């Protein structure tokens, strides 16, 4: 049984379950993350696309991979750059890929600068040719607003040496290393080879955050992602990998990309077992009430019924389970969070918070609670949709 918690932690437990998005709870992720079954396969230099429903933990997985290979306070194993999808109007095919690569190079330059400012020893101990290449690459690809960039870098420098290095790399003229008309692929190849000379094995471009672009038509974002994932010149570069975390709505289009067809990119689906979902749920609740650990039996004596309820109506995503259990957590916190709630409270919560019917009209998917109902006959679906609308 868990001990009584103070009012501050009670407030955390009742409010923190509102967001249920990893990017807004990054401080909790090291405490609550559970490795999916194929986690180890995601950590190398192979390009991959991981597909999952909204709330399945794609961003949490991306953040965990980043923490592993690019921890906050030590030099990284890989240069990890997160690129946010932003469909380019009236730009298609190869031109869209070039826009993506230019943006990725800009992000690489900013990330590399941040690493060197935080870890100036990496630069100071590097051979002169490596120092010259980094200086040139950063100058060639950072934003034009260098004063603003410098202000940001100065905040991240851990000592005066880092600040001085940041000023040098941003403002001091750099010697050109490659010709101005050098292809982006050649620039990336030169960058990765240089990074490897200081112990950074390569570059990961992580792509996440599709949801805002899927509220309307998915055609434009699908077309541009297919173009990027079909550019074999990028996918064949040594020390360069794309790791995309994509919603299920894009899966059928992405599978047509040349990179997947030719086996340059691995396609995987993010799934969880009921046991993993239980652990994720328990860890979230424990973190949010300030406890090192917690089990469903600590919330309520009806823990077996609660687990069955979650498996039946919580669906297959962590967000689904956390949404479903939110009323129980609220009741637990309101009661003082010192003793498991009785059966009567759980039975009352089931009556007052029944799982509701919802239909994704765009995707023709039917849900009760957070669980999808599969195998509906067309006639039954049309009737449900008519009543729902």
Short names for language-model regions:
Residues 1-48, 53, 68-74:
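A short, basic N-terminal segment
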Residues 46-47, 53-203, 216:
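P-loop NTPase nucleotide-binding core
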Residues 66, 105, 109-113, 311, ...:
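Short, amphipathic alpha-helical segments that act as regulatory/interfacial helices
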Residues 184-312:
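The catalytic "switch" region of P-loop NTPases
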Residues 289-293, 298-351:
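Amphipathic alpha-helical "lid/sensor" segments that cap RecA-like P-loop NTPase cores
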Residues 350-361, 375-378:
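Trafficking entry modules
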Residues 361-373:
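Short, Lys/Arg-enriched N-terminal segment that forms or immediately precedes the first helix
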Residues 373-389:
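Short amphipathic alpha-helical recognition elements used for nucleic-acid or partner binding
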């Amino acid at each position: 049984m868990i001990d009584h918690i103070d009012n501050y932690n009670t407030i955390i437990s009742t409010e923190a379950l509102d967001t249920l998005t990893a990017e807004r709870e990054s401080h909790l992720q090291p405490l609550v993350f559970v490795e999916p079954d194929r986690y180890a396969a995601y950590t190398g230099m192979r390009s991959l696309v991981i597909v999952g429903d909204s709330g399945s933990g794609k961003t949490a997985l991306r953040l965990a991979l980043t923490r592993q290979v690019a921890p906050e306070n030590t030099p990284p194993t890989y240069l990890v750059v997160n690129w946010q999808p932003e469909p380019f109007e009236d730009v298609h095919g190869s031109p869209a890929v070039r826009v993506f690569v230019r943006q990725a190079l800009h992000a690489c330059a900013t990330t590399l600068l941040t690493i060197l400012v935080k870890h100036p020893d990496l630069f100071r101990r590097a051979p002169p040719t490596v120092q010259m290449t980094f200086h040139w690459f950063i100058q060639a690809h950072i934003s034009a607003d260098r004063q603003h960039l410098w202000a940001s870098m100065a905040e991240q420098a851990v000592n005066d040496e880092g600040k001085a290095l940041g000023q040098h790399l941003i403002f001091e003229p750099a010697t050109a290393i490659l010709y101005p008309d050098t292809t982006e692929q050649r620039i990336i190849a030169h960058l990765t080879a240089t990074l490897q000379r200081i112990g950074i094995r390569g570059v990961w471009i992580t792509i996440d955050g599709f949801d805002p672009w899927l509220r309307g038509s998915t055609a434009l974002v699908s077309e541009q992602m297919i173009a990027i994932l079909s550019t074999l010149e990028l996918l064949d570069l040594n020390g360069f990998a794309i790791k995309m975390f994509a919603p299920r709505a894009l899966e059928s289009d992405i599978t047509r990309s040349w990179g997947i067809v030719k086996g340059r990119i691995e396609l995987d689906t993010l799934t969880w077992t009921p046991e993993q979902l239980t652990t994720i749920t328990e860890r979230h609740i424990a973190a949010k009430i300030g406890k090192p650990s917690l089990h469903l039996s600590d919330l309520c004596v009806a823990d077996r019924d609660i687990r069955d309820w979650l498996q039946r109506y919580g669906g297959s995503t962590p967000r689904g389970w956390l949404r479903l259990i939110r009323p129980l957590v609220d009741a637990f916190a309101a009661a003082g969070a010192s003793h498991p709630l009785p059966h009567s409270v759980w039975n009352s919560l089931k009556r007052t918070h029944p799982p509701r019917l919802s239909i994704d009209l765009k995707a023709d998917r039917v849900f009760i609670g957070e669980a999808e109902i599969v195998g509906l006959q067309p006639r039954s679906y049309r009737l449900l949709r008519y009543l729902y609308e």
